[in-house]
Amino acid sequence: MTSKSDSVTIREVAQKAGVSVATVSRYINQNAPISKEVSERLKQVMAELRYVPHAAARQLASQKTRVVGLLSNSLHNDFFVPLLNGIEGVVRKHGYNLLIATYHSDNRNMPPPIGPHNTDGMLVFSDGLSDDDLIALHARQFPMVLVHRTPPDSLKIPSVTVENKKIAFELIEHLIKVHKRKHIMFFRGPIHQEDSFWRETGYKSALMANGIPFDERLVLNGDFERHAAYQTLSKFIATENQIPFDAIFTGDDDAA
């Protein structure tokens, strides 16, 4: 079995495949059309020689990293895992790699780990970047798509979001009309979190639409975290003169 040698060069690949160095370069950088027959031959030769293009040289030649970044404030989320699997599948299908990093937008002592210096574009999940960070990257015309978050009003950045208000409204209305519930407790997430805000808005709208007064005492803080939700509910139940409730609507899976 042929072992990879660090001394294998692009010229050797070209000679063995019977093509020019320029053709090999075009194949590696995918910046010009090459016939299917030549592409297959180069693929086979590179595999036989165990030739791996130098990433830095490839990037310099093409001005592309062929890497898509994904930035999130947390990777420990039941919702995040299936989403990540789908993103990775699409990225690889188009010949790109996926670079994943966590970053908290309140950490001003260091720049975001993903950006124009190491990716061709970026997916920003939830609160991965502050509005100021987004504005700065957008000013540099760096391609971005926001996931599970709407862009600042001043920016036209593509976004993929969930209709939180509509879904929460329908869930609460289902509890009211089908299960005849009138005292519905709501576990919200962090107060300034976008998803939490719109789910609470949908909750309140459904109560109002069905003639049920909103009772602020039935809105508890779960912080999108199971331990916090458990502690909050335990404290609520142990309280004297407990407010009656006949259903619980949680704003996330962890609280549920």
Residue ranges and their predicted role:
Residues 21-25, 60-75, 183-190:
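Short beta-strand segments enriched in small/hydrophobic residues
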Residues 1-64:
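N-terminal helix-turn-helix DNA-binding module of bacterial transcription factors
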Residues 172-184:
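Glycine-rich phosphate/diphosphate-binding loops that line cofactor/substrate pockets in enzymes
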Residues 49, 116-118, 178-181, 236-244:
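Glycine-rich phosphate-binding loop signature in dinucleotide/nucleotide-binding domains
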Residues 13, 24, 42, 68, ...:
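Hydrophobic structural packing positions in well-ordered secondary structure
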Residues 1-5, 66-173, 238, 242:
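Alpha-helical recognition/docking segments in bacterial nutrient-uptake
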Residues 119-126, 183-187, 241-252:
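Periplasmic-binding protein-like
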Residues 73-82, 100-109, 160-170, 186-234, ...:
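Hinge/beta->alpha junction and helix N-cap segments in small-molecule ligand-binding domains
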